[in-house]
Amino acid sequence: MSLTYYFSGSLTNDMMNYLSNMPNYEPIDVLVSQLDRSSIRKMFEFQDKGLVNKLFIDSGAFSFHTGKAKLDLEEYIDYLNSIDDRITICAQVDTIPGKFGQPKSKQDYEESARKSWENYLYMRTKLKSPQKLTPVFHFGESFDALRNILSWRGPNGEKVEYMGLSPANDTDVRIKNRYLNECYDVIHNSSNPDIGTHLYGYTSLPGIPKLPCTSVDSISHRHIAAYNKIYLPKYGIVSITDRPRTVGNKSSMSFIQTADEAAKSEVQDYLKSLGTTLEECRESSSMRCAVTMYGIIQYVKENPYKPDNVKKAKKLFNI
């Protein structure tokens, strides 16, 4: 099964117009927070036009965790039921461990696992399509909580079909990948080894082929474009500003300022094949976003997961 890459966040008409006119365009998959209802309606419009395929609705639990939003569980359930025929997957209202910005205790992780599981079971009883609902397992919670998700059986013998893994996205990617591989060891040795898994906020493209996940989501295409950069399959993320490097922007050394003429010509030809130019990318954030999304799509297609991609390391986590 090929990986589903969900582009996270809102997409504009300009972004979709640019992207959909690039070679061999296929409908993309999108994750949107339920807190952004206007963007969800926009995704419905794109679905109707054949531009968006799968739609993943996130609960907005992280915004609630940071204090930036309020969540009404019953209203969220009603909303999911009202759009059930439009969505592929939806996230439970989970409890993120601890308090935002503060050190976490063992009790915080125990409480988050318990409350998240209770919410998941409750939401299952209320949704039109409970199989679309994903429970969430958070970095730092006991692996017993993961085993609990995997061993659960409903009154008719049904299993959890799809679950979310929430790694600590502020952790070094090497630590994060080792943790996720240990999660997959637990999954593969469980009574539900074929469960679908979604990695929340997973931004490392090189890491994707090393993990047997079903799907990931990332908003990196927006962040890359916002910093006047684009993702190129051959060169990775490059800055296309025409400003010279300074002490304050060492991480933004411009491709335009540093690349040789052969490389510049190669990139110009690549962008021309997509229907754009380096100059247009410098001027348009929407075009930078579209070019980056196109490159990500190509990378994911050309770099599928293979067990041989994984080098087993000594276990770091107590499972």
Regions found by a protein language model. Give the residues of each.
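Arginine residue identity/basic-tract feature
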Residues: 37, 41, 86, 114, ...
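Glutamate identity and glutamate-enriched acidic tracts
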Residues: 26, 45, 74-75, 106-111, ...
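An almost-null, non-specific background feature
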Residues: 64-68, 96-99, 126, 142-146, ...
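Non-catalytic, usually N-terminal nucleic-acid engagement modules in DNA/RNA processing proteins
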Residues: 1-128, 297, 304, 311-319
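Alpha/beta catalytic cores of nucleotide-metabolism and tRNA/nucleoside-modifying enzymes
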Residues: 1-23, 77, 81, 91, ...
